[in-house]
């Protein structure tokens, strides 16, 4: 019999972070680095726990090169060939430890991942990514990949509830991707009615993972630096970004000019555009669960990354956290009916403003 859970689940837009007494004098005092030891691979990692999503127009080799300079991680999209990887590895061998090779649960994907990892042993991360991480087929794929690569750090998802986080960790994953439907170009919730508000999903999944010494990624739903900070405050060990990193020089695809404005294309990996590009079209038995949009051209991604980290550092000063590690212990969320005063409209994106000015003067 169908049942209703009456407890209200929350999204980033439903809360604000309550400020607390702080001894910090400047944002520059905040350490945004983290160091982790992973549950099953037993590897240690240190860096800034922000990850570029494994999407065509985000998780590119060009993005990986730039984000490596900031000690971010890039989950490279799965549509590069082994030859593409060989060319990239020859040019940028120092970037390989900061990237994940991505794939799904199919035999072809696992075979491709295996070929790439055998050719490039410096790659330390594997990202096993499917829309529905609740499938037993996916759990078995995680077990198989763990058996084949005992020392690689496995990212697996997506799920939104604690029991499945535990299942995947016990099956060999190290980091669980949390999020079904929150992405800016994802239409899963509309097409299927399935999903879970992202803030509550992160809170519940982080609690389950940390009980087993596992880790979680908040994947999707961030629209601004404040959302990234809320995800960390909710217990996310990493935050994965798609839309916030789209539209840059490193994002793949050509610039489009419409009415004098430069734009770039951004689309979900379950959109009809992605399926036409990689699978020859949308299969008769399924529906598109993503959309294709154009976003303002934003120039180099480094500027946006600095803005994101600046916002997170500022959050830490408001709650008295001298290290990013401390933010979840210092965070108290308050439910709100309104977050912003938008009497003069949306605040401009500084990166977009700078690019727009250059276009006008150029």
Curated annotation (Swiss-Prot):
This is GMP reductase. It catalyses: IMP + NH4(+) + NADP(+) = GMP + NADPH + 2 H(+). PANTHER family: GMP REDUCTASE. It is an enzyme of class 1 (oxidoreductase). HAMAP family: GMP_reduct_type1 (MF_00596). Keywords: Metal-binding, NADP, Oxidoreductase, Potassium, Purine metabolism. GO terms for biological process: purine nucleobase metabolic process; purine nucleotide metabolic process. It comes from Phytophthora infestans (Potato late blight agent). SMART domains: IMPDH. Catalyzes the irreversible NADPH-dependent deamination of GMP to IMP. It functions in the conversion of nucleobase, nucleoside and nucleotide derivatives of G to A nucleotides, and in maintaining the intracellular balance of A and G nucleotides. GMP binds at residues 219-221, 242-243, 268-270, 286-290. Belongs to the IMPDH/GMPR family. The keyword NADP applies. It comes from the Eukaryota. One of its GO terms (molecular function) is metal ion binding. Pfam families: IMPDH. The active site is at 186 (thioimidate intermediate), 188 (proton donor/acceptor). CDD domains: IMPDH. K(+) binds at residues 181, 183, 186, 189. NADP(+) binds at residues 26-27, 78, 129-131, 180-181, 269, 285-286, 314-317. InterPro entries: Aldolase_TIM, GMP_reductase, GMPR, IMP_DH/GMP_Rdtase_CS, IMP_DH_GMPRt. GO terms for cellular component: GMP reductase complex. Its EC number is 1.7.1.7. PROSITE patterns: IMP_DH_GMP_RED. The keyword Metal-binding applies.
